[in-house]
């Protein structure tokens, strides 16, 4: 779907949502957020864009943990302003690569239409991979993405918005690179999240899944196109999105399985850490890309998702697993079951009610 069309659809969806709000809510002012936890708000084109509304807006922040300005999309339930004492569960939704929370993305209106829940889409960089990079001295600058999200964004949101700041009221999910990030954060911080979801996620980085590992390496080194195998599809993959290139060792050290030099990659493999998800609600969505225009990216990711399900099953850990194949029976938006926004949109239509029914309800 062309980017311009996505933006137009996002604007239209926002207008429709506002048109159906009660007058008092439609006129309500956007919450004022206070700097803190290492985050400083700055004015940017994204934070002042005319597409921002009082219930769906972008703020831009700076942090010593990550280089440059970072966008954070905040989506409030329609009754937020009209109920000043009501508190809400939160979904942290992690985008893919290369992408940006300020872009008009596939699930904006689904997330915006979710009653009783706050959704936060934090910047993960074009290829941040939701980790603190091993090498902090690359041309890309500071890249402590995990610190940024876990130690700064989450407490900033809890301090500024009426959240229910407990594990049982907090979910994390993501698409592609963001699916990897969601599982990684859930596994490393099980005390923070009670629900985790992956939409076409990169769920396996072990040595037996070298194709996906090398796709990550391609994004680091700025190989032409970087396979766009992790792409969420809302940014042109030919616009040098992965510049400047950095060394293949920058993220988790050597990615090459020689004399166990790649041990950090194996340690970061979500499949290898499946046991750490015990007790959480787990949701995995994947296609096979075999719906006409064959999408080999989703085929690779299908294998990773299947391995995750097999590992969870072997551990006796329940998982809601949707493999919709070529997408023919998944829903009208998923054409071909590929690595593309229509299928993720359909995934969110299924996922959001599941999260709402599992999280501590707004009250």
Language-model region placement:
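Secretory targeting and sorting signals
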Residues: 1-29
């Amino acid at each position: 779907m062309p980017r311009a069309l996505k933006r137009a659809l996002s604007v239209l969806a926002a207008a429709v949502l506002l048109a159906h709000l009660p007058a008092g809510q439609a006129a309500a002012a956007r919450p004022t957020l206070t700097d803190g936890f290492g985050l400083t708000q700055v004015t940017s084109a994204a934070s002042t864009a005319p597409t921002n509304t009082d219930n769906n807006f972008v703020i831009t922040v700076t942090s010593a943990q990550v280089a440059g300005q970072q966008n954070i999309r905040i989506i409030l339930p329609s009754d937020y302003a009209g109920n000043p004492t009501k508190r809400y569960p939160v979904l942290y939704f992690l985008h893919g690569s290369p992408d940006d929370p300020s872009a008009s993305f596939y699930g904006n209106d689904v997330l915006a239409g979710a009653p009783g829940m706050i959704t936060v889409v934090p910047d993960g960089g074009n290829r941040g991979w939701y980790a603190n990079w091993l090498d902090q001295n690359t041309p890309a600058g500071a890249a402590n993405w995990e610190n940024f999200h876990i130690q700064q964004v989450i407490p900033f949101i809890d301090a500024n918005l009426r959240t229910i700041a407990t594990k049982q009221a907090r979910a994390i999910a993501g698409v592609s690179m963001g699916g990897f990030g969601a599982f990684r954060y859930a596994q490393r911080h099980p005390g923070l999240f009670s629900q985790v979801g992956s939409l076409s996620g990169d769920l396996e980085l072990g040595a037996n899944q070298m194709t996906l590992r090398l796709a990550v390496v391609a994004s680091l080194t700025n190989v032409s196109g970087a396979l766009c195998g992790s792409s969420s599809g809302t940014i042109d993959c030919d616009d040098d999105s992965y510049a400047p290139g950095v060394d293949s060792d920058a993220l988790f050290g050597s990615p090459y399985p020689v004399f166990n030099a790649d041990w950090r990659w194996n340690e970061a493999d979500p499949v290898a850490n499946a046991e750490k998800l015990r007790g959480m609600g787990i949701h995995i969505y994947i296609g096979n890309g075999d719906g006409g225009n064959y999408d080999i990216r989703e085929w690779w990711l299908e294998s990773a998702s299947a391995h995750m399900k097999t590992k969870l099953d072997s551990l006796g850990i329940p998982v809601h697993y949707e493999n919709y194949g070529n997408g023919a029976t998944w829903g009208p938006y998923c054409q071909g079951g590929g690595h593309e926004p229509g299928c993720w949109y359909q995934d969110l239509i299924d996922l959001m009610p599941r999260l709402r029914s599992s999280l501590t309800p707004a009250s």
